[in-house]
C-alpha cells in the first residue's frame, strides 16, 4: 500500500452528461493517499465517429503523469487505427494501447517518468460493446440486476501472466512483479519493459489489453467502470446492487458515484489498507433511446440471476471471449498459492459461474 495521510481528502470531483442513449455520471476522490493518481474519460460521441461512445478509468501508480497522459490520448490512438475505420474494434483497441505505450516511451513529457497506469475502456457503437483492459481496474454491466463482468484482473499470480514475466527475465514474489508491482499489465512502467529479445506483448509488464465483446439488449441497464479502490471493497454484484437501488429511486448517476466512493472509504487505514486507495468510478446508464424514467423503472424490477452459460450450452459473445481467456490460463494454477488468502473472488480471471 502507498503512503497515506493522517486524514482522508474527501472532496470529490464529479461530472455528468447525457444524450438519447446514455445517462452518465462520474466521480473521483483522493481519499487517504498522499496524491491523486487516477484519471478517467467519458465521451458520449467521439469527434471522428459520432456514433461511437468511449468511457475509461485509469488507475495510476508511482505518479499521475502516465494516467493523465493516457486519459487525454488513448481514445485518439484507438480511433486513429485503420482497423477502427474497418470495423475491427478489437484490433483497434489492442493496437491503440500498444501505440500509446510506445509513444510515451519517446515523448519528452513521459519517457523518463517512472509511473504507470491501469486502463479499462468501454467503447460502444451501434449496440456493440468492446471492453479493453490492462491491469486490475474493472468494468461490469448490469443485466436485469445480474452483474456481468466485461473484464478480468491481470495479476502476476495468474499462471499465464507469471510465465510471461519469468520468460522475459522477471519473477513473481509475494504476488508482485519482481516483488514490487501488484499488477502484470499496465501502460507505462517502462522499467519492466526492457527485454530486447521480446516484443511489447511479451515484456515483463505489457500494455497489451484483453478485449471482451458484448451486444447490448434491452435488459442491459448500466455499466460501471472503476479502479480497484472500489473493487477491493465491494464485489461486482454488491456494486451493481448498490447502483441499481439508487437508480430505482431516480437518483442521478453523478450523486450515485459520489455515494459509492463514500461507501468504500475506510474509516481509518489500520486494517490492511482496504478503502484507503484513490477512488474513481464512471457510471453509464444505458437508455436505448428511451427516457431516463424507463431506466429507473427497469432498475426497480426484481433482479434475475441466470448464470453466465445457458443450460443448453449456447453462449453469447462475451461468454465465448471469457471462456477463451480462461482456456488460455490453463486452469489458472497459482504461483505462491500460500500468499493468496487476501485475494477476493472477484480478483479471479472470471467468476465461478463462468463454466467452461
Swiss-Prot record:
SUPFAM superfamilies listed in its UniProt record: PP2C-like
Enzyme Commission numbers on file: 3.1.3.16
One GO molecular-function entry: metal ion binding
Keyword Hydrolase (UniProt): yes
Swiss-Prot/TrEMBL cofactor(s): Mg(2+); Mn(2+)
List of residues binding Mn(2+) 2: 59, 228, 277
Record key words, sorted: Hydrolase, Magnesium, Manganese, Metal-binding, Protein phosphatase
All copies of domain PPM-type phosphatase, residue ranges: 23-286
InterPro entries assigned to the protein according to its UniProt record, in alphabetical order: PP2C (IPR015655), PP2C_BS (IPR000222), PPM-type-like_dom_sf (IPR036457), PPM-type_phosphatase-like_dom (IPR001932)
Co-factor remark: Binds 2 magnesium or manganese ions per subunit.
GO annotations of cellular component type: presynaptic active zone
Residues annotated to bind Mn(2+) 1: 59-60
Region Disordered, annotated ranges: 336-356
Pfam name, any one: PP2C
GO biological process, alphabetically ordered: negative regulation of axon extension; positive regulation of synapse assembly; signal transduction
Catalytic reactions on record: O-phospho-L-seryl-[protein] + H2O = L-seryl-[protein] + phosphate; O-phospho-L-threonyl-[protein] + H2O = L-threonyl-[protein] + phosphate
PANTHER family according to UniProt: AT28366P-RELATED, PROTEIN PHOSPHATASE 2C
Family: Belongs to the PP2C family.
Name the UniProt record assigns to this protein: Probable protein phosphatase 2C T23F11.1
Species whose genome carries this gene: Caenorhabditis elegans
Lineage summary: Eukaryota, Metazoa, Ecdysozoa, Nematoda, Chromadorea
This protein's encoding gene: ppm-2
